[in-house]
Every structure is written in C-alpha cells, then in structure tokens.
From Swiss-Prot:
Single GO MF annotation: carbohydrate binding
Subunit structure: Formed of four alpha chains and four beta chains.
Protein family: Belongs to the jacalin lectin family.
Phenotypic consequence of V72I: In minor forms
Protein name: Agglutinin alpha chain
Occurrences of domain Jacalin-type lectin (ranges): 1-133
Protein task: D-galactose-specific lectin, binds the T-antigen structure Gal-beta1,3-GalNAc.
PANTHER family: JACALIN-RELATED LECTIN 19 (PTHR47293:SF15), JACALIN-RELATED LECTIN 3 (PTHR47293)
Species name: Maclura pomifera (Osage orange)
Effect of mutating K52T: In minor forms
A UniProt-annotated Pfam family: Jacalin
Keywords: Lectin
Coiled-coil regions listed in the entry: none
C-alpha cells in the first residue's frame, strides 16, 4: 500500500472513511482541529471501489475519542483492517466492516488522539495514532 502521515494537530473534528461489509476498511480522510480552525487532511483513498461511506462528525471540542477498536484479518492474502469502531466520551460509532479476525483495542486513558498515519492499498493495511498528553 501507500503510506500516509497526517501529522499531529490540536484535535479531531470529523472522520470520514469507507468500508465494505464483506471485505474490509477502505479510504480514510480526517478533518482535524488546528488551533481552533478546521483543517481537512489529504484524502487517503483505496485503489479500488465498492465501499460504503461513513462520516463521523464529533461535537468538537466537548466530544473526543476515548477508544479505537476493530478487527484485523486476511482478505485475498493481505492482512488488513477489517473493522473499525470509534468510541467517544459521549457515544460509540460502529462497528463498521467485518467483525471477524483478530480483535484490537486502543483505549486512550490520558491524552487526545491528534493525528493518524498508516498505509492504504486496496484496503487500510494498518494505522497508528498521534497522542497529545
């Protein structure tokens, strides 16, 4: 896949991504907060089509992500992110995608998620997060 690195900002306002209920997570585009102003990061798109769009608009700054979870598994021989769930201090969004494979969970006990990086090919291969403490 193609690696991406959005860098770190001052918060997250909106998360847009795509999923397929039979395969995995596709593209990802995040609207961050940059010192009180929205900043739309680059659209990291899948190489293929056939996904359903998801738009998660957070009530920034009072709503923030406290956990990212999901499933990792094989699709056509590739290990990819098959499912994503975003839990905020107010509600849970998801799960989106295929909830089977190896589960993962990134609970955030201290700090805020302020950025994403990862790799996307046909599907979201992997991602990691930037934290602000």
């Amino acid at each position: 896949g193609v690696t991406f690195d959005d860098g770190a900002y001052t918060g997250i306002r909106e998360i847009n991504f795509e999923y397929n209920s039979e395969t995995a997570i596709g593209g990802l585009r995040v609207t961050y907060d940059l010192n009180g102003m929205p900043f739309v990061a680059e659209d990291h798109k899948s190489f293929i089509t056939g996904f359903k769009p998801v738009k998660i608009s957070l009530e920034f700054p009072s709503e923030y992500i406290v956990e990212v979870s999901g499933y990792v598994g094989k699709v056509e021989g590739y290990t990819v992110i098959r499912s994503l769930t975003f839990k905020t201090n107010k509600q849970t969004y998801g799960p989106y995608g295929v909830t089977n494979g190896t589960p993962f969970s990134l609970p955030i006990e201290n700090g805020l998620i302020v950025g994403f990086k990862g790799s996307i090919g046909y599907w979201l291969d992997y991602f990691s997060i930037y934290l602000s403490l």
